[in-house]
């Protein structure tokens, strides 16, 4: 089981033949992965995946990521037939942190998230650096650098209220069918996570030398313009680094774009997705330079 686990999602992100070379003795990062060259000795690269459909239809921009992350091909568009890998990892290692996982998306739409327990329980992503900061380092954050903190009586009351419904819950579960019981279990799992969060907020955190509460990010726009998405990505990534250092979470997911890759340059109507379909291949370079 990993100590920390995270995913970055960038749909339609690599041009075949321009990301990784064919060497077998070590990873050979090419033009589109030059930024990773300094870390070549610390990275394992996996590619050329294939997703057996088991007789099910291939739903474009959906089947691929679902099958890769759940090991099961979906039957219907929008179907997520099993938990994504990060959810299983979070179940194993995320129980003793304030947040079982942190999910972020750079598109401005919280539903552009690729982590879910099932079709009906998809984890929404934080869309702005300021919202992410408020969640991680705002109300409820216990700074390891400060000692002598006292339990918040409001938090203690919230925890006691949650604990007080357990008997009613158990009686109610005995009256419903298996499908409804499964849905209720998902709901009460989230309640248990909240109870854990409240309990941790009443404890003085262990000293963490690398933990430094960051500054509040500047207010800014969200959306699908590439410069906006990049700026929000960089700001949220910096907050994420400190969230991990402060042991606020051990599992995270970052979505740079949506499954259709709808990012676009300022002042243009063509999205990245449209360019991959319609832009001509440059005969000199062998790829679509704008895409």
Where are these regions (language model features)?
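Ligand-binding pockets and gating/stacking loops
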Residues: 1-291
């Amino acid at each position: 089981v990993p100590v920390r686990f995270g995913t970055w999602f960038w749909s339609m992100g690599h041009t075949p033949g321009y990301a990784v070379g064919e060497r077998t003795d070590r990873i050979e990062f090419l033009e589109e992965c030059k930024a990773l060259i300094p870390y070549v000795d610390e990275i394992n690269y996996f590619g050329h995946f294939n997703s057996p459909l088991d007789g099910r239809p291939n739903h474009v921009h959906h089947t691929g990521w679902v099958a890769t992350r759940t090991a099961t091909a979906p039957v219907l568009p929008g179907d997520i037939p099993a938990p994504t890998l990060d959810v299983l990892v979070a179940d194993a290692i995320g129980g003793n942190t304030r947040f079982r996982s942190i999910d972020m998306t750079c598109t401005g739409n919280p539903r552009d998230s690729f982590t879910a327990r099932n079709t009906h329980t998809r984890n929404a992503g934080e869309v702005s650096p300021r919202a992410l900061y408020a969640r991680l380092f705002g109300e409820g954050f216990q700074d390891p650098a400060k000692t002598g903190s006292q339990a918040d009586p409001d938090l203690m009351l919230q925890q006691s209220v949650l604990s007080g419904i357990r008997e009613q819950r158990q009686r109610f579960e005995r009256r419903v069918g298996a499908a409804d019981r499964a849905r209720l279990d998902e709901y009460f799992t989230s309640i248990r996570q909240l109870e854990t969060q409240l309990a941790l907020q009443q404890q003085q955190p262990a000293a963490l030398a690398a933990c430094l509460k960051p500054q509040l990010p500047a207010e800014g726009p969200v959306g699908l313009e590439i410069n906006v998405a990049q700026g929000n990505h960089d700001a949220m990534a910096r907050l994420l680094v400190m969230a991990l250092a402060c042991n606020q979470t051990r599992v995270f997911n970052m979505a740079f774009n949506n499954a259709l890759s709808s990012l676009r340059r300022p002042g243009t109507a063509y999205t990245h997705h449209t360019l991959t379909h319609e832009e001509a291949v440059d005969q000199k370079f062998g790829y679509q330079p704008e895409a």
